[in-house]
Amino acid sequence: MEELQGYLEIDRSRQQHFLYPLLFQEYIYALAHDHGLNGSIFYEPMENFGYDNKSSSLIVKXLITRMHQQNHVILSVNDSNESIFVGHNKNFYFQMVSEGFAVIMEIPFSLRLVSSLEEKEIAKSHNSRSIHSIFPFFEDKLSHLNHVSDILIPHPIHLEILVQTLHCWIQDAPSLHLLRFFLHEYRNSNSLITPKKSISLFSKENQRFFLLLYNSHVYECESVLVFLRKQSSHLRSTSSGTFLERTHFYGKIEHLVVVLRNDFQKTLWLFKDPFMHYVRYQGKSILASKGTHLLMKKWKSHLVHFWQCHFYLWSLPDRIHINQLYNHFLYFLGYLSSVRLNTSVVGIQMLENSFLIDTSINKFETLVPIIPLIGSVAKAKFCNVSGHPISKSVRADSSDSDIINRFGRIYRNLSHYHSGSSKKQTLYRIKYILRLSCARTLARKHKSTVRAFLKRLGXEFLEEFLTEEEQVLSLIFQRTSSPSYRSHKERIWYLDIIRINDLANHS
């Protein structure tokens, strides 16, 4: 306990108490513009919003002043979308403040991460950031396990929980008050958070801001797993996550251990399971074990109880599904993963005797589901719900090469992301859809038929369109067998993919 107290004292000294004044600094919004997430409002031309770059800090200052005034007309629920700043949409100001607020809130987290990496001497590896690195882990571990739990992490039932979560990390009272006021007013003024709907944690308009809130919330939910992993002698590991440590963590865990010892003395052994593995991406997590079904049910019960009692999160039991790996497809990150028993017969010749031996090996397989992927492509209007390619509307000044490059880039990104599939038939189907959709789009632009357009363009269109992936694979896997066969069977995991492809995200 003395060691923990010493850690807490050091951690308190690192807390940031003067973050609020940074909201009025111009360079904060320049950082939000330069390093924001794709799809952020700051990636759009500022002139589209009638916005002068040089006056950004003045606008933010005026907005925050209005927010703190008793009569905050700009945020009134009964107002229209136009604020008192003539010509500016009020949602734009919310996005400005949220982007800047997210940049500021990331400062203490970044400092803790750098400090933790230095203390634990963890090398900064970009490969560990890739979500594709999860699947080699699956290949190595899942084939030896028995049961898996699909877990949907519960959402906070009240906005105040999000504020209190950040309060454990940051003790800057003005910033927290602004965050609380900002969240409630944003919800009440045609925002992304409405009383009738759950919190939109992955808003396209405020990705950086809500990802910050969501990651801190999820880390709280996972804290019991982090603690138990550190306590078990069989589960020694070093984490490289962004939210590595947090204030008041051990205070809550100490109380949890007391509760467990008083109420569940006979079941503490389950936390020592040496074959438990945990993986998460966004709101979905996976808990896999070599233990029995009863063990997994106990884990499920304790997780639900922990979330409800210590974080006031109401998690329904049906949000955690327990299945056997051998007869269940695990849907994760756009892949259907499973463990299959492959049986092979080996002939052995020993002097005058020969005999056959049956060998069985557990093999990890990953497939791309065709129906959800076609649904995503249809939603993007490349085909109808039946998978029949259709033309897309394009700008009149778009050149043919730009259109072809756009369709080619979409397919290459999909093929790049789904390169780990055990079977490539789904990708070939998507390739056919996108290629014919491109041809229909070009034919529509030139007021011609697809056949006449392809005849005029020649066979170079088919050779040049979307063949880069197959060419790369054929160069990598030059074997005695045909390249097409090798590219059909080989799985490749790329370690430069840090987010799920939009078309691959069918959830």
From Swiss-Prot:
One of its GO terms (cellular component) is chloroplast. GO terms for biological process: mRNA processing; RNA splicing; tRNA processing. It is found in: Plastid, Chloroplast. It comes from the Eukaryota. GO terms for molecular function: RNA binding. The keyword Acetylation does not apply. Keywords: Chloroplast, mRNA processing, Plastid, RNA-binding, tRNA processing. It holds the Pfam family Intron_maturas2. The keyword Nucleotide-binding does not apply. Belongs to the intron maturase 2 family. MatK subfamily. Usually encoded in the trnK tRNA gene intron. Probably assists in splicing its own and other chloroplast group II introns. PANTHER family: MATURASE K (PTHR34811:SF1). This is Maturase K. It comes from Magnolia alba (White champaca).
